[in-house]
Amino acid sequence: MKTIMIAFIRGYQKFISPLTPPSCRFYPTCSQYGIEAVKTHGALKGGWLTLKRILKCHPFHPGGVDPVPDKKQKH
């Protein structure tokens, strides 16, 4: 599942993103954030973090640096 999600995001980066002007107000970009989130947290939690990030990407949010949170260690 992780591989499929990352392939989908990479497809977006390669084929769709170049057709639109740069508009992401965050660093890293939302698509790069999605890849990092899925790699770090897996498909379910990484997908959820990516969805939350995309929903924040609008003109009324200031944006800025928003890294993927670290994976919490189980004790």
Curated annotation (Swiss-Prot):
Annotated membrane topology is: Peripheral membrane protein
Q: Which Pfam families match?
A: YidD
Task: Keywords in alphabetical order, please.
Answer: Cell membrane, Membrane
Q: Which InterPro entries match?
A: Membr_insert_effic_factor_YidD
What GO terms fall under cellular component here?
Answer: plasma membrane
Q: What is its main location?
A: membrane
Return the protein name: Putative membrane protein insertion efficiency factor
